[in-house]
Amino acid sequence: MEKKTVVSVLIAAVIYAVMFVLGSTCGLIHPACYAYAGTVIPLLFGFVYLYTAARWQGFGAAAILNGVVLIIGLIAGEGNLAMVIGLIVLALLAELIRKSNGYDTLTGVRRSFIPLAFSFYAYSAHWWTDTEGSLAAAVAEMPAGYADRMAAVIHNTPMLIIMLVLTVPVAMLGIRLAEKVMKKQAASLK
């Protein structure tokens, strides 16, 4: 592996991590924006993943992306058990799917992106796995009334299910948009 490839993939991973920060800050608008950003953000994730997978045609494209997010999250004190397990499991699923479909194929990238697209939900999962702790943190860190609005979002399980289901077609759209815009990277895959 060339040094230039490693550096470019690490830069892509940092950009991917910045997208997590952008997704989480949209929660300042309303708690639902944070809770469901994981459904929309794959439109952006697709570009970073296609670039990374085209440059890194072997095991590790998804693992590097989620690994950098995990390391930065833990250093920043944002890591929790749900996030750690979620990011690792989703990256491993993506890697297994990509391996079974071919590291150098567009089909492998498309199919493996579906589990990877759920990665922001691994980051925000603490709302559902540690609701009391998340609400307490909201009371301490956010404006008055935020925790009440947040609780309403957390307890709206039907909407969470809908948003999780919608993540799949949004992920498929995100990777297809990336292919249309990033023709060189898409062409480097069979």
Residues of each region from the PLM?
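Short helix-perturbing small/polar motifs within transmembrane alpha-helices
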Residues: 5-7, 11-14, 18, 85-125, ...
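Short alpha-helical transmembrane interface motifs in multi-pass membrane proteins
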Residues: 30-34, 78-79, 158-159
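Membrane-embedded alpha-helical hairpins and interfacial helices in multi-pass inner-membrane proteins
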Residues: 109-184
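Membrane-water interface at transmembrane helix exits
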Residues: 19, 23-27, 53, 57, ...
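Hydrophobic transmembrane alpha-helices
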Residues: 2-63
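Alpha-helical membrane segments and adjacent membrane-interface helices in multi-pass membrane proteins
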Residues: 37-96
